[in-house]
Amino acid sequence: MVGTEASEGTRREQLKAERRRRLLEAGARLIADRGFLGVRLDDLGAAVGISGPAVYRHFPSKEALLVELLVGVSERLLDGGRAVLADHDGGDPRSVIAGLVDFHLDFALGEPELIRIQDRDLDQMPDDARRRVRRTQRQYVELWVDALQRVHPQLSEGEARVRAHAVFGLMNSTPHSATASDAERVRPALREMALAALVGVS
C-alpha cells in the first residue's frame, strides 16, 4: 500500500514536471511570436491543454515564467561555455574558439525564440532578475574575451570584448533572418565567418 502511494506520488510529480516543461516551451514560442505583453495566462494554459488559472500551479506569475526562461538560458550558456573551456584545457587556443563558436551556434540555431525574447522583453523582468541575467551574460562574454586574448595576446580586453560582441551579433541575428528550415543550411557560413573574425584577426 505504501509502495503504491509512493509510486502514485512519483507519477504525479513526473506529470507536473512534464507540464511545467511544456509551459516553458509554449511560453518561449508565444512570447517570441507576440511579445511578453501580448501573451495572456489563458494563452499559456491553452497551449498545453489547461486553464489560465491552472498555470499558477506551476508559476506564481507570467513574469516568473519569463524570468525562468531568460535566467535559465543565461546560466546554461555560462555553464556550457565553461564546459568548452574545460574540455580544451591545455590544448590549442584556436580549438577553444572553435568550440565556443560551435557551442553558441547550437544555442542560436536551436533556441532562436529565446534570443528574440531577450532582445525585446528583457526589460519586462523584475530589476533583480534582469541584473542577474546581465551579470551572467557578462561572465559568459569574459570567457570569450579570455579565449581571444590567448589566441591574440596583442588584443586589449576592450578590443577582444568588442570582437566577441560583434560575433555574437552575427550568430544571434539568425532568429531574425532565417527560418527553422534554414538553420542547418546557414550554419556553415555563420561558422566560417565567426572563425574568420575571431581567429583571423590581426
Kindly give the residue locations of the regions a language model identified.
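Helix-turn-helix
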Residues: 22, 26-64
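N-terminal intrinsically disordered/low-complexity leader segments
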Residues: 1-18, 202
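Generic hydrophobic, amphipathic alpha-helix propensity
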Residues: 19-27, 44, 69-73, 77-80, ...
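Amphipathic C-terminal alpha-helical segment
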Residues: 107-110, 157, 164-184, 195-202
